[in-house]
UniProtKB/Swiss-Prot annotation:
Residues 150-152, 312-313 are annotated as: Interaction with tRNA. It comes from the Bacteria. Catalyzes the 2-thiolation of uridine at the wobble position (U34) of tRNA, leading to the formation of s(2)U34. The record marks H128, Q346 as: Interaction with tRNA. The active site is at C103 (nucleophile), C200 (cysteine persulfide intermediate). Residues 98-100 are annotated as: Interaction with target base in tRNA. The keyword Cell inner membrane does not apply. Belongs to the MnmA/TRMU family. InterPro entries: MnmA-like, MnmA-like_C, MnmA-like_central, MnmA-like_central_sf, Rossmann-like_a/b/a_fold. One of its GO terms (molecular function) is ATP binding. NCBIfam families: PRK00143.1 (NF001138), trmU (TIGR00420). This is tRNA-specific 2-thiouridylase MnmA.
Amino acid sequence: MVDNSKTRVVVGMSGGVDSSVSALLLKQQGYDVVGVFMKNWDDTDDSGVCTATEDYEDVKKVADKIGIPYYSINFEKEYWHRVFEYFLNEYKKGRTPNPDVMCNSQIKFKSFLDFAMDLDADYIAMGHYAKTVKDADGLTHMMRPKDGNKDQTYFLSQLNQDQIKKVIFPLANLTKPQVREIALANGLATAKKKDSTGICFIGERNFRKFLSEFLPAKSGKMVTPDGKVVGEHAGLMYYTIGQRQGLGLGSTKESTDPWFVVGKDLKKNELIVEQGYDSKLLYASRLKASDMSFFTGKPDHDVEFHCSAKFRYRQCDVGVTVKYHADDNTADVYFDEPARAVTPGQALVLYQGEECLGGGNIDAAYQEDKQLQLV
């Protein structure tokens, strides 16, 4: 049996069941485990309760139960500058960002990793559902976990080799129900705690209300692709490509089909809408992605390859051909079949079978050579 007692793992504990079980499993495997609660946001919910205080109390209970030391670290300043300012700037540009991807690359696997190394950690761990394997050359590869329904490789897609080689994913071969069972069997305080949902710093709060506290909303016209005014929008930042809900538009003489957001015109402050799920304006043949990241290192030359991809969380993989450009670290990605509602600002994530190759940020979508008016 391997002696792990001299290997220190610092576990980022959120106060949720997943990171609680991660810490427990590592402790059971004999590692020298230290729990750390990260406070990334000054979060008070709509009822005035500071959820971080409640979460830290749960971390204390779990750490005491499994017998590990615990600390709390505040990354609010780093989070504001590296994640939240990016989030706001993307919305100002009319894009729909994914701050959780940025939070992982800049905070959880950067600021937290640095802090853990100062605690003499050999590895870090959290409650993510992902898996890593090491090849014969010593390179660490990111793989999909056993629980495909909880697969979080999408959100980890912009980490690099130096980051993932320092990570253990204790939940790699477990399903969420199994994690709950382990927590219950070991009497962990978080065993029945519900999962957090939505963007981490918004939590259960109303999204529009939250965003309006930081960005002034400017109402404007809702127009059809040919310019006909059909309504008024509350602010372009509140809408995303392909959105159906919340438009407040009814059927017309021509059609009873629901309306969808098919574009944005920032200069005119107009939201472009059209009836019908299959609006041609929602389908792209290719996209342009920037800031590409690959787990095993960026190619030092242009390369073309076929793989599968996701351009939003939880969607099924779609076949793509990737043309990577080494000079500016961008990629042109061609879909095997036209793809619906490709949204600038979201993450593009590439897969080869069970392996997650990496990803980048979606900048634009095209129908052949024509750029879709998505921002």
